[in-house]
């Protein structure tokens, strides 16, 4: 208990808005690293993501997308340090919001500077996805970003709480105001919206499919996202441990996590582990993959553990209570963002293996790609 109190005291040095900002900056660094690792493994990631190709496709330093991601990572780090310094010096978290706001303005500002074209494409992608749609010729990057939003769903919901704290809190920011100002209904609706986006995208994909097989798999994919809704909303009412609603909540979480894990491995990563798990022949890949089977097995195990992180709720009450504290919630959000970053890397790797999107070290191309203008 003393350790938990110490951790909660430590997290109070980082107000909620900075914890959320940290997760955004971490995601940017992770994406930059993903691009780097894919490029050094000869994956034509910039073509897969429909971004302008650099002159030398094997050098990510020339790619505008990599340059923007890396620059935003550095900028985010500097603004985070400034925001934290302002918070520690002033003792008020209002000033900490200013650098975070500046970061958002820089990302979306309609100024022809700082990789304007890439930011414009990203802004239009955000507007398109928030409307629950995607461009058929831009499907892969849209789906990647939409799935990324599902892992940031609780982070996005906490933005509402951060806004409420900014508006209503007048006392010491060192106190946790989560229980006082969080609205579970509103925050659950916000958290569910990214899943609703993917659910609608799957229905659109199903309606436009040309054959029954594509319709079938699109239907199964839509069911995966639909199973997230009970896991989100039942938590509002399942307050009493071992009640019927509590068991129903955990059951729905188990169904969603297991289904999503199977889809991650079998469909998104195109791994054959679940065809006949006891047959070693089915653990061999029929197409080019970047890593040996053991690597994929380890990553799949990590994905399973992180998908099942919700089981902390069934721990003894004195242990599960830690994950309802500010520090515990932050750790769970961080682990989910980390899991999604790993998923993104291997999702792009799987797409490259299916489409043979690899480049030769001497391959040079200045052919532009189509963007959703």
Curated annotation (Swiss-Prot):
Q: Which residues form the signal peptide?
A: none
Where's it found, cell-wise?
Answer: Vacuole membrane; Endoplasmic reticulum membrane
Q: How does it sit in the membrane?
A: Multi-pass membrane protein
Q: Where are the transmembrane segments?
A: 20-40, 69-89, 97-117, 149-169, 216-236, 242-262, 291-311
Q: What is its main location?
A: membrane
Instruction: Give a Gene Ontology cellular component term annotated to this protein.
Output: vacuolar membrane
Alphabetized, the UniProt keywords read: Endoplasmic reticulum, Membrane, Protein transport, Transmembrane, Transmembrane helix, Transport, Vacuole
Task: Tell me the superkingdom of the source.
Answer: Eukaryota
Has the keyword Magnesium been applied to this entry? no
Q: Which PROSITE patterns match?
A: EXS
- Limits of the EXS domain: 178-373
| Protein name, as recorded | Protein ERD1 homolog 1
Family statement drawn from the similarity comment of this UniProt entry: Belongs to the ERD1 family.
Task: Write down the species.
Answer: Schizosaccharomyces pombe (strain 972 / ATCC 24843)
Per the record, the gene is: erd1
């Amino acid at each position: 208990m003393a350790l938990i109190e110490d951790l909660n005291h430590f997290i109070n040095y980082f107000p909620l808005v900075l914890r959320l900002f940290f997760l955004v900056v971490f995601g940017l660094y992770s994406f930059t690293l993903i691009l780097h690792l894919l490029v050094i493994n000869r994956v034509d990631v910039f073509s897969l993501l429909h971004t302008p190709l650099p002159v030398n496709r094997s050098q990510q330093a020339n790619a505008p997308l990599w340059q923007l991601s890396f620059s935003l990572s550095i900028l985010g780090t500097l603004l985070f340090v400034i925001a934290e310094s302002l918070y520690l010096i002033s003792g008020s978290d209002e000033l900490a919001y200013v650098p975070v706001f500046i970061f958002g303005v820089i990302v979306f500002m309609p100024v022809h500077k700082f990789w304007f074209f890439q930011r414009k494409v990203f802004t239009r992608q955000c507007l398109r996805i928030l409307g629950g749609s995607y461009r058929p010729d831009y499907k892969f990057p849209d789906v990647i970003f939409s799935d990324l939003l599902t892992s940031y769903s609780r982070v996005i919901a906490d933005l509402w709480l951060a806004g409420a704290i900014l508006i209503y809190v007048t006392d010491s920011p060192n106190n946790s105001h989560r229980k006082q100002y969080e609205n579970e209904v509103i925050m659950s609706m916000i958290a569910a919206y990214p899943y609703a986006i993917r659910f609608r995208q799957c229905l659109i994909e199903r309606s436009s499919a040309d054959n029954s097989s594509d319709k079938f798999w699109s239907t199964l994919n839509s069911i995966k996202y639909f199973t997230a809704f009970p896991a989100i909303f039942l938590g509002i009412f399942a307050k009493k441990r071992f009640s019927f609603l509590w068991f129903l909540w955990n059951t729905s979480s188990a169904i969603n996590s297991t289904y999503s894990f199977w889809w991650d491995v079998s469909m998104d990563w195109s791994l054959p582990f679940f065809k006949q798990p006891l047959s070693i022949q089915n653990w061999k890949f029929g197409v080019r993959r970047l890593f040996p089977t053991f690597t994929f097995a380890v990553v799949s195990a990590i994905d399973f553990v992180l998908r099942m992180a919700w089981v902390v709720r069934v721990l003894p009450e004195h242990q599960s209570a830690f994950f309802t504290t500010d520090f515990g919630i932050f750790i769970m959000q961080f682990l989910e963002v980390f899991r999604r970053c790993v998923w993104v890397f291997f999702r792009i790797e799987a797409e490259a293996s299916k489409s043979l999107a690899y480049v030769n070290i001497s391959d040079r191309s200045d052919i532009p790609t189509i963007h959703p203008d």
